[in-house]
Design a protein with these regions (language model features):
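Extracytoplasmic/peripheral linker and loop segments enriched in polar/acidic and small residues
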Residues: 126, 415-426, 454-523, 547
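Long beta-strand-rich cores associated with HINT superfamily self-processing modules
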Residues: 519-547
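Ligand/substrate-recognition segments at binding pockets and active sites
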Residues: 60, 228, 375-444, 489, ...
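Gly/Pro-rich hinge or "lid" segments in bacterial periplasmic/extracellular proteins
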Residues: 108, 187, 193-245, 249, ...
Length: 547
């Protein structure tokens, strides 16, 4: 059902003109196009009103006060963990399924389905399963299910996008009812990362082709229903082998429009959102007595991806010029309101393998013009050097960033066309190579050095991986292969350092920033223990009192 909102202004309330003045000065400093200024100023004024009322928006069912309504921007595309690659699917899968291992907020691994595990040598991983674990349908989870899950992904006939992550697995052995042994063809330093619930959750051995329509896992929540582009409903599982979640039911309601998400929270018909609102709206909502804001530094990377098979973007000088023509600090300051940290590379700055001597590209439009001249793209009579197209999502912030890039790049002679697309279409186009530049975000995957191979190796073009820009560099291929098998962390770090220096020069991506994780939620939920990756696993221990 479409969400419609009508606005009424309380006659005794006034607007916060100081914030509005700051907002307009921010836009002027960025010199955004008039259309962007007009549309977003209306948006801001709309939410800056002291009193807002809605008509036609659904509200929480008062007969079910312990349920939680979580607003999300888009539907998960596939809840089968053998195929899920989009962030919404992986985050919800992390609640529905269990993995052999799990990872805490400090990125340390612990047993999940595995009660214990060992690596007697670099090619052998032995897992001993917990006793008494059951799927949500009551059937016992066995070593047969574990083996079948991984072998399904490894079978090329099934075309799982996760097959490449397991290509070093030679065989899987189940010598008894509680033991699973993985035999690798060569050492794989990041193998454990593929064993957490959001990466590869264990499914029943008989899971068929329609499994994504009614997934059955063994995680803290069980699937109830999904209405595409409307909602996903989960409820706590009585079969869960650990302490049951305190929240009986979570309703992930799909509300694509940021205005409506904010108004739903303002009205009280939703309980929380996470990193889905325009940063300018958050202070307005934070002033509401029943709402609170919890935030923390995040690891999710926003980036510009370049298609290196494009005849223009295949020039390294052009990619470097685009980096120099982008005033990222201004974008963070004025459009993100400081809720992000400038990125120099794809690894978070406090990561053990991050290279400190790789610095972010500075804002230097004069140098950008020199590079464009040298690459053979002089200004024409109309002042335009190039015409490029940026594909992004339809969310407000993406379109606003795109409009700012239009203006910044115009100053160096680049005419940028924006093409906002629904997420499913955007992901499909990018995977097919049907793009020049894309504005996207990496969620979670960039917290391990194995990401370099997954995103930049020439062996990892889709569907085998995420090298969507078809970047080719034989040295990167060799280094990322070594990173995957090197078990010594200091040696691995040295390999990662060289990779980061090459990527900073070649620039197949322009790392923009690491977004803070920010949640607007009902104050009665308390301070949320938000993970830096933005996952939803905190819901398993959240208390829903005061609904």
């Amino acid at each position: 059902m479409p969400h419609r909102a009508s606005l009424s202004i309380h006659p005794r309330r006034t607007l916060d003109f100081s914030r509005i003045s700051f907002f307009f000065s921010s836009l002027r400093s960025l010199r955004l196009c008039d259309l962007c200024v007009n549309s977003f100023s209306v948006f801001f004024l709309f939410l800056a009103l002291a009193e807002v009322s809605l008509s036609g928006c659904s509200s929480r069912n008062p007969s079910d006060p312990s349920s939680l309504t979580f607003l999300i921007e888009s539907s998960p595309t596939n809840l089968d963990p053998r195929f899920a690659t989009d962030s919404q699917s992986q985050r919800i899968d992390g609640l529905l399924f269990s993995g052999l291992l799990e990872r805490d907020n400090q990125m340390n691994f612990h047993g999940d389905l595995a009660e214990s595990w060992s690596t007697p040598d670099p090619l052998t991983y032995v897992f001993h399963l917990r006793h008494g674990v059951r799927f949500h349908d009551g059937r016992a989870l066995t070593v047969t299910d574990v083996k079948a899950t991984f072998e399904f992904i490894m079978n090329p006939a099934n075309k799982s996008p996760k097959r490449g992550a397991l290509r070093m697995v030679n065989s899987i052995e189940t010598p008894d009812e509680a033991t699973v042994i993985f035999h690798l063809s060569q050492p794989f330093a990041s193998f454990s990362l593929n064993l957490i619930p959001s990466a590869i959750g264990i499914v029943p051995a008989n899971a068929g082709a329609d499994f994504s329509r009614h997934p059955i896992g063994s995680g803290p929540f069980r699937f109830v229903q999904q209405s595409q582009d409307e909602e996903v409903v989960v409820e706590r599982s009585p079969e869960y082998f650990r302490d049951a979640p305190r929240i009986p039911r979570v309703r992930f309601r799909v509300v694509p429009d940021g205005v409506v998400r904010a108004l739903e929270l303002r009205k009280g018909s939703a309980d929380l959102e996470m990193s889905s609102l325009s940063p300018d709206i958050i202070p307005v909502l934070a002033r509401q007595p029943d709402l609170a804001v919890t935030d923390r530094p995040g690891t999710n990377l926003t980036y510009l991806g370049f298609n290196l098979e494009d005849p223009v973007l295949s020039h390294r000088e052009v990619r470097q010029a685009l980096a120099l023509a982008t005033d990222r600090e201004a974008l963070i300051r004025y459009l993100l309101h400081g809720q992000a940290k400038l990125a120099a590379g794809v690894l978070p700055p406090d990561h053990w393998a991050a290279e400190p001597n790789v610095a972010p590209y500075p804002y230097d439009p004069a140098r950008a013009e020199q590079l464009l001249d040298a690459a053979g793209f002089p200004r024409k009579q109309d002042g335009v050097r190039l015409q490029l197209t940026l594909k992004c999502s339809t969310e407000e912030q993406a379109r606003l960033i795109g409009a700012a890039l239009q203006e910044q790049w115009r100053r160096v002679g680049i005419q940028l066309e924006l093409r906002p697309l629904e997420l499913a279409t955007l992901f499909s186009d990018v995977a097919k190579g049907n793009f020049q530049i894309t504005y996207q975000r990496w969620v979670g995957a960039n917290t391990d050095p194995d990401f370099f191979e997954y995103a930049f190796s020439s062996k990892r073009f889709p569907p085998e991986g995420a090298n969507r820009g078809h970047y080719r560099n034989s040295r990167i291929d060799a280094l990322t292969d070594q990173i995957r098998v090197e078990m010594n962390q200091e040696k691995r770090k040295a390999l990662c350092s060289e990779v980061q220096k090459i990527l900073a020069d070649d620039l197949p991506y322009l790392p923009m920033w690491f977004n803070d994780v920010v949640s607007v939620h009902r104050r009665s939920l308390g301070t949320l223990e938000l993970p830096s990756t933005g996952n939803y696993n905190f819901l398993a221990t959240l208390h829903a009192s005061g609904n």
